[in-house]
A protein has these predicted regions:
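Polytopic transmembrane helical bundles with strong interfacial aromatic enrichment
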Residues: 1-328
């Protein structure tokens, strides 16, 4: 297949995965609509309601498989072939896949299928935003990104993002359930508060060392290789460190101050807010960041690359690339 055929196939696979996620979301909501609005100990699910929930999980699994195919095809569409992490569109479709994968793994281990409606709604919204608002042109990687550190750094960052996102969903559900005076419908499907709190903690405890590896180890090493300095106080670096501090405070407070329940849940939500602001806000609103890779449809974007000169000074080169024109 040619590069153009791989690119077209990737688009079609993403569209197919989006349709499957949407159908899974509908199945989950059909399950919720079929729940009796009575107390947990009186609630009885009919066969069709249970089948809708199982169908939602099966559709989510199939969607994830198609989603993975789309990512592979996206990488094969580039010349030379590369990992699909060259711009915000590619990061979005990669990140949403990891969120779904984390959901499926957690559901397999701890039976958290009740997260399905939230996860599929989030993924459908994110993929729709990627389709409508981001430039999906396949371009070669800038020199600064063309490194094996891209794989090491981004894999760890994306894995931790998936864990933190699932942890935040669990924390949000904890807060909603803890304020409810009567457990009916969806809330009756949730596990008890103690387990919600414990599952959220486990997701954050898993994600934090991976995020540390991405932000404080591989990131600085890669920055030194690309730009000649381990730390540049770039806006994205600063916000990544802020996110690290928030999650460090979360884990420290739980371990030493005995924070549980609402206080820990609020802090977890602050952490995920800084995480996603770093991904979305910095890319769209900070033109000074060397990490900016966001572009809308038909919009020009700037990639700033520091080229180390043979002399002591560092020369900064700006490359402006339009969505419909080749790189200069």
């Amino acid at each position: 297949m040619t590069d153009l055929q791989w690119e077209t196939f990737s688009y079609q696979a993403v569209e197919g995965a989006s349709v499957l996620y949407f159908l899974a979301m509908l199945a989950y909501f059909v399950e919720l609509a079929g729940l009796r609005t009575v107390a947990r100990d009186e609630e009885v699910e009919d066969r069709r309601t249970a089948m809708a929930g199982r169908l939602g999980l099966v559709l989510t699994s199939f969607a994830a498989a198609v989603h993975l195919v789309a990512l592979v095809a996206r990488g094969l569409a580039a010349d030379p072939n590369r990992v699909p992490w060259g711009n915000m569109y590619e990061f979005t479709i990669s990140g949403t896949f990891v969120v779904v994968l984390a959901f499926l793994v957690v559901t397999r281990i701890w039976g958290t299928e009740w997260l399905g409606p939230l996860v599929t709604t989030f993924v459908v919204a994110a993929l729709m935003a990627a389709f409508l608002g981001l430039d999906d042109t396949v371009l070669p990687l800038p020199d600064a990104l063309n490194s094996y550190w891209l794989v090491i750094h981004v894999v760890s960052a994306v894995i931790s993002t998936g864990a933190f996102t699932i942890g935040a969903l669990l924390s949000g559900l904890y807060l909603v359930k803890s304020r409810s005076t009567r457990e009916t419908g969806y809330l009756a499907r949730l596990t008890d508060l103690a387990k919600l709190d414990r599952l959220s903690y486990r997701m954050h405890a898993f994600g934090f060392p991976v995020w540390t590896f991405a932000v404080l180890i591989t990131g600085p090493i890669w920055a030194h290789q690309a730009w000649g300095a381990y730390w540049n106080w770039d806006p994205k670096e600063v916000w990544a460190f802020i996110t690290w501090v928030v999650y460090a405070a979360y884990l420290h407070a739980r371990a030493t101050a005995g924070w549980r329940g609402r206080n820990a849940a609020y802090l977890a939500l602050v952490g995920v807010a800084t995480l996603w602001f770093n991904f979305i806000g910095i890319n769209f609103f900070s033109s000074a960041s060397q990490h900016s890779y966001a572009e809308g449809l038909g919009q020009e974007h700037s990639v700033v690359v520091d080229v180390l000169a043979p002399v002591e000074a560092t020369q900064e080169v700006g490359i402006v690339v339009g969505s419909d024109q080749p790189a200069l």
